[in-house]
Swiss-Prot record:
The gene is UPF2. GO terms for molecular function: RNA binding; telomeric DNA binding. Changing M1120E: Decreases interaction with UPF1; does not reduce NMD efficiency. PANTHER family: NONSENSE-MEDIATED MRNA DECAY PROTEIN 2 UP-FRAMESHIFT SUPPRESSOR 2, REGULATOR OF NONSENSE TRANSCRIPTS 2. Changing R1176E: Decreases interaction with UPF1. Residues 1-126, 370-389, 423-445, 490-517, 1018-1098, 1220-1272 are annotated as: Disordered. Its main location: cytoplasm. Changing D847K: Does not abolish interaction with UPF3B. This is Regulator of nonsense transcripts 2. The keyword Repeat applies. Keywords: Coiled coil, Cytoplasm, Nonsense-mediated mRNA decay, Phosphoprotein, Repeat, RNA-binding.
Length: 1272
């Protein structure tokens, strides 16, 4: 314990110390010169002089090394912290991404439900409307039919016509109007008809009605007028029927009948028959004859299918008794009743049904035939695309026409099938065979969403897919009024985009032609190597110049103080700082919210176009900005693509060998926009084709840059795969034929294999039973620090009675390298909990781990290094969780330094000279469990092992394989120093192989002496070190203060310093620590007796036989310990006082000054601080005074602590005195005030006690805390 430090000597005393020291040295030299020879004097003087610099140099080196170690340790800690922070950030981002995905899925599901509900509601409304219209039409027809059938009985008499207008002018005008009947003229025509006498104009009126060019919507008005004619004039219906028959007979001679007129006429006569103007016999026969003529003439081409569909839709329910499938489903789904067909009997409807079904059968045959032809055309076009990369214009145009007619035929077939309540025929789709699209990926069956990590995916990983596909929807955040001007243009562009997409899809599937024509076309079709030009190149250049010129004009016209202009300029200046997805999305939203004007959009396009050529990292984010803004402002993408297209065309035309960075920037920007689908794939492939047409110099770099940017996207997209593959093969052929430079060859190969990597062998996943897969999932995936208890519960539920399951679990635990390195301790924890229920599992796992470690040393192959590291780590964790004894750990450690190592130091095949992996294994085990070898016998065992370990390390360092050119790895030195500094911070490391060997020899000699195998005479040289060893062992019993004496005083804050505070507790702790290896009782017998220095060796102990008395005793002991713990839990814990009082006789000795006449002693006492060391041997306490130099950290810290305590005492003293003085002044002022208010003399201090005046001026506690007399 440190005593009170003496005051330092004055400056005069310090100055006089060197002189006194020199005098004493000279006197000693004169006296000794008489007794010793001169040579001895010189040698001793040299030793004394040279010893001090060496010690100082060693201290400086040690301080420097420790400082470096601390700095390195600090850097490592900072690195670990940075890694942890990055991991946390990644986990947070992952969680955030998962949360966003979950929200998107929920929103999508909600939106889907809403859409389904809206669709169902819309369907219901349509069904109800259809139901209402059907009933209204049914009632109108029925009412009108009854009127027309009863017309002969209700026609007016002759005198009625005399009152009507019979003038020629009005009647001829009315007849002319009948040639242009429309629904809007119904009321006016009905009014004119009621006021005219048309009995002499019936023939003209009939001719006008038959010749009228009606629309489908005007038929009802014409039927209404015919009903009026029929109800008033008896000869109208026969005349009309005769005219219709003549009209249809004349139409038979027409080669190209008018389909619109035919459709209208057929419905017209059907409506006239339904409403009763024509009799059923006359009308139905006319309708059947005309319908049969149409169908017979159209059985092959089916050009009149629209006429039949119109007839079935408007009149099929009454004429043919048709009930459409849509009506049936609506009636069943919404419980609606549609009107029955009561106008015409079912017997008369049957011929019409048969005729229509025959027509539908022929239509389906036609559809199947066209479908087969279309499939053949698709296969032929794929062959052409695969071989040549593109289709000819004639074939392209021919297929477009054929595909359009097929789609029209398919739609008509579906409509007619619904009206006739028939099923559509099966139209199977062709599955493309591998030879159609050649070797490589299957681009026609792309992976499902979430399978982009598989071979054949468009994107390299999930992050790339999210970056290029998951864009924010500005329309969901920005008010619609901010992009209202662009809505129409956006819709037009989207429709054009859809048309273009259909054209592209049709480009893959084309046309009808014979095999001979196809072969001829394949031979004639070649890729033209002439210089190609992009369409609209001149317009693109003009747009570039126009936009760049407008910048100067706007800058001149814009007012310098414009607030919006300042905002836009600031936005464009900050745009290069948007280097991640969140920032660029925020910038897009900001621009759309605050700066969406035509002029600002042009400024943005210019800023994006003139991005610096060195900032290629900005191009993906700028392309994302353009793609994000595209739904709201499509002109940004269009203008930018046009400018890039013109710039590309300019560079290709110029053919200079400068500005390669600008060229690469342009093509890379085009590639990024292509991946966002802003730049069309056709244009991108056309750019690549232009570069391949003149494949030299900069064009090679531009082509490779373009392919490295978007080649994978183009090659793996179905619509561009074939053309891209053809262009890639052409590029490789040109590489072979053109004898390019080695740099260009490498670039071309890299670009090609980036787009189309060679097929890799797929790893076949081993199939295991479900229970084994579940065990592997628990141990290798689910197990973590948080889920250990949960996994243990699940593991306990396994069928342990099944030996196969038990063996598999043991095997999985032994194969610890399959577990994440940071989760190995969780497996040890799990095993420790599992052993309580399955005892033999722990034994088998430990045996397996030890066997694997031994096997690793025997095989010694580098591919097992990570596996061996995991096994060593697992063994250390098993000791931490008390699954193995310390003897197993030390046996393994010694095997690392001795197995396969030749005693004579010669190289061994099991441990080659350059092989340092065993050192790493030792450090791994010591880093894992070495911290628990800090006291008792395990501490001494570790100290002994470290001696042997240093010898092994120095033996490795001394081998000839390590030279100046190939030095010993510094990371191994750092790893060893880190491990030893953690375990024994005060250990003195060896500096050479000889020193390490000498330490091993000394250590072995000491133990041989203790064992009595060597006489003391043979080891006189080692007596002093043997005494030191005994002192170390004695001091281990009483405490760890010797660590302070033997090591560096700077490490005074170690936990060992606390052990000397209480001797009894220390003994108990040491006994408890010695018995930590509790798995077997024999370990206690093997430990060294702490009371005696002799070593006792015992053989195998007696086996413990369990009995009932032992179990009763253990139960009673557990009960007593539990009661004791419950009693002690209520007691207050007494904190141990670290400072032990110094005996009085030592205090008086310490207060005495240094011996007189000793200048050197005074100097030493001035530079040192006296401490008292308390030791104990047996029951006897021993005190020893230590003079610790002031340069040590221990003395400096204690001196600073004393000064701080002294300052705190002085501060409290001053504070207390100030409080007392202030209280006295307040009392005095109060007394004067009370005397002034009461002139009459009175005893005011009658109840107040007299003030106690402390002799030293201490504060009055009663006065301060007001516990004295009462105040008034």
């Amino acid at each position: 314990m440190p005593a009170e430090r003496k005051k330092p000597a004055s400056m005069e005393e310090k100055d006089s110390l060197p002189n006194n020291k020199e005098k004493d040295c000279s006197e000693r030299r004169t006296v000794s010169s008489k007794e010793r020879p001169k040579d001895d004097i010189k040698l001793t003087a040299k030793k004394e002089v040279s010893k001090a610099p060496e010690d100082k140099k060693k201290r400086l080196e040690d301080d420097k090394r420790k400082k470096e170690d601390k700095e390195r340790k600090k850097k490592d800690e900072e690195k670990v912290k940075a890694e942890e922070e990055s991991k946390k950030k990644e986990e947070e981002e992952k969680k955030k991404h998962q949360e966003e995905e979950r929200k998107k899925q929920e929103e999508q599901a909600k939106r889907q439900q809403e859409e389904e509900a809206a669709a169902q509601m819309k369907e219901k409304e349509e069904s109800i409307q259809l139901h209402q219209e059907a009933w209204e039409r049914h009632h109108l027809r029925k009412e009108l039919r009854s009127k027309n059938q009863n017309a002969p009985d209700s026609r007016p008499e002759e005198n009625f016509f005399s009152r009507l207008d019979s003038s020629l002018k009005k009647n001829t005008a009315f007849v002319k109007k009948l040639k242009t009947i429309t629904e809007q003229q119904r009321d006016s025509l009905s009014h004119d008809f009621n006021g005219l006498n048309l009995s002499k104009y019936i023939a003209e009126a009939v001719a006008s009605i038959v010749e009228a060019k009606l629309k489908i919507s005007d038929v009802n008005c014409a039927v209404h007028l015919c009903s009026l004619f029929h109800q008033r004039y008896a000869d109208f219906a026969p005349s009309l029927l005769q005219v219709w028959k003549k009209h249809f007979e004349a139409r038979k001679e027409e080669k190209t009948p008018n389909i619109t007129k035919l459709r209208t006429d057929l419905r017209f006569i059907a409506e006239l028959t339904i409403v009763g103007i024509f009799t059923d016999k006359e009308g139905l026969s006319l309708i059947y004859e005309q319908l049969k003529n149409i169908i017979n003439a159209d059985r092959e081409s089916h050009t009149h299918v629209s006429v039949v569909i119109s007839f079935c839709r408007h009149c099929g329910d009454d004429i043919a008794g048709l009930v459409p499938r849509k009506v049936k489903s609506a009636a069943e789904k919404f419980n609606l009743s549609f009107p029955p067909s009561e106008i015409i009997s079912p017997e008369k409807q049957q011929p019409f049904q048969n005729l229509l079904k025959e027509y539908f059968t022929s239509l389906t045959k036609h559809l199947k035939r066209d479908h087969r032809e279309l499939q053949n055309t698709e296969r032929q076009n794929r062959r052409i695309l695969h071989s040549k990369g593109e289709l000819s214009e004639d074939r392209h145009k021919q297929y477009e026409e054929f595909a359009m007619s097929y789609q029209k035929l398919l739609a008509n077939s579906q409509s007619l099938a619904d009206l006739l309540d028939e099923n559509m025929p099966d139209l199977p789709q062709d599955k493309p065979t591998p030879e159609e699209h050649g070797p490589g990926i299957d681009i026609f069956t792309p992976g499902k969403p979430g399978e982009y990590d598989l071979e054949g995916g468009i994107w390299e990983d999930e992050d790339a897919r999210n970056f290029y596909e998951n864009l924010i929807d500005l329309k969901a955040f920005v008010p619609a009024i901010l992009f209202k001007d662009n809505e129409k243009s956006c819709q037009n562009k989207e429709s054009n985009k859809d048309d273009t997409k259909e054209a592209k899809e049709s480009k893959e599937n084309k046309e009808v032609s014979s095999p001979d024509d196809l072969e001829l076309e394949l031979e004639n079709l070649e890729i033209n190597d002439d210089t190609l030009e992009l369409e609209g190149g001149d317009e693109a250049e003009d747009l570039t110049k126009k936009l760049l010129d407008e910048q100067e004009q706007e800058d001149e016209e814009a007012s310098t103080g414009s607030h919006l202009k300042l905002i836009v300029d600031a936005f464009l200046q900050q745009l290069p700082n948007c280097v991640n997805r969140d920032l660029i999305d925020k910038a897009a939203m900001d621009f759309c919210m605050n700066m969406n004007t035509k002029a600002n959009r042009k400024k943005l396009v210019r800023a994006l176009f003139i991005v610096p050529r060195q900032r290629l990292d900005l191009l993906p984010f700028y392309a994302r900005l353009v793609a994000t803004l595209h739904p709201c402002m499509s002109d940004v993408a269009e203008d930018l693509c046009s400018m890039l297209r013109g710039d590309f065309r300019f560079h290709v035309r110029k053919k200079d060998q400068i500005n390669i960075e600008t060229k690469n920037k342009t093509v890379r920007f085009i590639g990024e926009l292509t991946k966002f689908k802003m730049f069309t794939k056709n244009d991108t492939l056309h750019c690549l084709k232009m570069l391949l047409s003149d494949f030299s110099h900069h064009h090679i770099e531009m082509a490779c840059t373009l392919l490295e940017t978007c080649g994978r996207f183009l090659f793996r997209s179905p619509e561009s795969h074939l053309r891209t593959s053809v262009l890639l093969e052409q590029m490789m052929r040109k590489k072979q034929a053109m004898h390019l430079d080695a740099r260009y060859v490498t670039m071309v190969e890299n670009a090609y294999y980036y787009c189309n990597p060679p097929p890799a062998e797929k790893t076949v996943k081993k199939k295991r039973p479900p229970l084994q897969e579940y065990v592997r999932k628990l141990l290798y995936k689910d197990l973590s620090k948080v889920t250990t208890e949960k996994v243990l519960r699940q593991m306990r539920k396994l069928p342990w009675q099944d030996q196969e399951v038990k063996d598999y679990v043991i095997c999985c635990m032994i194969n610890i390298w399959n577990v994440k390195y940071n989760s190995i301790h969780c497996v040890a924890n799990l095993l420790a909990g599992l052993v309580l229920y399955q005892e033999d599992v722990g034994i088998h796992v430990v045996d397996g781990v030890l066997e694997d470690i031994r096997l690793g040393m025997e095989v010694n192959q580098p591919k097992f290094n990570q596996r061996r590291i995991s096994s060593a780590k697992f063994l250390g964790e098993l000791y931490n969780y008390r699954m193995v004894e310390s003897a197993v750990i030390f046996r393994t450690l010694y095997s690392f330094t001795s197995f396969g190592v030749n005693p004579d130091g010669s190289p061994s095949s099991l441990d080659p000279p350059e092989h340092l992996f065993r050192i790493r294994l030792v450090c791994t085990i010591l880093d894992t469990c070495g911290q628990y070898f800090d006291r008792g016998s395990s501490k001494r065992k570790l100290d002994c092992f470290l001696v042997y370990f240093q010898r092994y390390v120095w033996w490795k360092k001394s081998l000839e394989v390590w030279t100046k050119d190939h030095p010993f790895p510094i990371d191994i030195d750092y790893m060893i120093s880190d491990t030893l500094e953690l375990l024994r911070p005060k250990i003195k490391l060896c500096n050479s192989l000889e020193e390490s060997i000498r330490q091993v020899q000394d250590l072995e000699r000491e133990f041989l002496i203790k064992l009595g195998l060597v006489n003391d005479k043979d080891s006189k040289d080692s007596m002093t070190e043997g005494e030191n060893l005994e002192e170390d062992e004695e001091e281990e019993e009483g405490g760890a203060e010797t660590e302070e004496q033997s090591g560096n005083e700077s490490e005074v804050n170690e936990p060992e310093e606390e052990e000397g505070s209480d001797n009894d507790d220390d003994e108990g702790e040491e006994e408890e620590e010695e018995n930590t290896d509790y798995l077997t009782d024999s370990n206690k017998e093997n430990e060294t007796d702490e009371e005696n220095t002799e070593v006792m060796i015992k053989g195998g102990g007696l086996k413990h036989v369990p009995c009932v008395e032992d179990e009763d005793f253990i139960q009673a002991l557990d009960k007593m310990m539990l009661e004791n713990l419950q009693q002690r839990s209520g007691e207050s814990v007494k904190v141990h006082q670290l400072d032990v009082a110094i005996p009085l006789h030592l205090k008086s000795q310490l207060r005495k000054g240094p011996p007189l006449g000793g200048g050197e002693g005074e100097a030493e006492s001035a530079d040192t601080m006296p401490f008292v060391m308390l030791t104990r041997k047996g029951n006897k306490q021993q005190f020893k005074i230590l003079n610790v130099p002031m340069s040590s950290q221990l003395a400096a810290n204690h001196w600073n602590q004393q000064q701080a305590e002294q300052e705190e005492r002085m501060r409290m003293k001053k504070l207390t005195l100030d409080i007392n003085e202030r209280q006295e002044q307040e009392d005095y002022q109060e007394m004067l005030q009370s005397l002034a208010q009461r002139p009459a003399p009175a005893n005011t201090n009658r109840e107040r006690r007299p003030r106690y005046q402390h002799p030293k001026g201490a504060p009055n506690a009663d006065l301060i805390f007001k516990t004295g007399g009462r105040r008034r």
